[in-house]
Amino acid sequence: MQRRTKIVATIGPATEDPKVMDKLIETGVDVVRLNFSHDKHEVHIKRAETARERAQAHGRTIGVLVDLQGPKIRVGKFKQGKIHLNEGDKFIIDADHPLDQGTQERVGTTYKTLPQDVSRGATLLLDDGRIALWVEQVEGTEVIGRVVVGGELSDNKGINRQGGGLSAAALTDKDRADIKVAAAIKADYLAISFPRSAADVNEARELFRAAGGLGGIVAKIERAEAVENIEEIIRASDVVMIARGDLAVEIGDAAVPPIQKRIIRLARAMNKIAITATQMLESMIENSVPTRAEVSDVANAVLDGTDAVMLSAETAKGKHPVAAVAAMDRVCRVAEQEYEATHSRHREDQTFRRVDEAIAMATMYTANHLPVRAIAALTESGATALWMSRISSSVPIYALTSHVETRRKVTLYRGVYPVAFEITSSDHAEINRSAIDELRRLGTVRDGDMVIITKGDLTGVLGGTNAMKVAMVGNLPEFPESAK
């Protein structure tokens, strides 16, 4: 059985070689992530080209996700490269201090408005929360703190404020330039780092569209303010990514698991996509097998209903990138066999405003109550397939479309598989036969299998799906005994 949960893999030095990319695609990567926090534009352009070329060579469609860096809120560099802070030490972050002249007592910062964002009593977390600094006072450009959790601090480590409250804009000048590159490479998804509200998401979408970008917008949930505004952010986005690293620093690591479950639940209820990310198989950067805790983490994300799970450093710079993808694939497949992963009561008690949405829900209800082998969703935009994918089921959904952008988009939808399909006839019976023939060619159905076909009366019309047909492969005259 095909895996329903999608795998997003970050491409970096460990995986940019075409031969390694071949192995990633063969092992099951659905979407490649390009992290614009690192490397030059031409490097990312080449990686996107390679991913698409190798996917095509394997007869597959792969999505490309561009991840913007967002605001850099970091300490500067130290003269000696690093220092060690002990509990009780006085330490100053000075917005006017030279960025490359950090000492044991003082360091500069890339975030020049830090003194305006904090006051006495605030807690600053450095290096993903490994070091905690209690703010005693703010004097001019100096944030004067006392170390409450010590440790080693090296160049360019991040700064977070416990509970949120740093006012840095979600989109920087670098991000605006990167958005134009993302549009030029026809990114299927654009991820915004550190959005605080729907306004940040809308601004990114406007800039992306103005640059010619057609892909979906991913809101990375990694600020405390984003959690407070989560419903409006989900509504404004196409996808939400639960970026658990910075999020855990701001709200506390113990708060992340219930927030993760809530975000996934809300995203599915709003017919949006959810990606679970950060440290999913972190140990595999060095080791060839995951820890038991990592296996449980991936499996629980699948059982929560996440559409996709993401690998970051594991595939970007890890020693075992292909093994990491294989491990994630294996864990997802086993988790998907559990009852809660294939059954759903999503929206059973709600009414619908659109015919195509009602058809999608009716299709999944029928598929889950008859021995249906596959669903062929003839689609222009992929909307019908998206709505279907919100219903937990073991029945695969094939999005048949002539639009390459739609095929790439659905690579992130749980349980949906893209298929290139051209409608060459206006006769509905002929279209149905062609759709079934395509499923037969893929090896997913054979004579005697039951399938569901959804389509519209008018081809080429967005939102035009208004028909659902239950059909038998091979045109058998009646249902099999098990379906009666």
Please provide the spans of the model-predicted regions:
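Non-catalytic helical/linker scaffolds that mediate oligomerization, partner binding
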Residues: 1-484
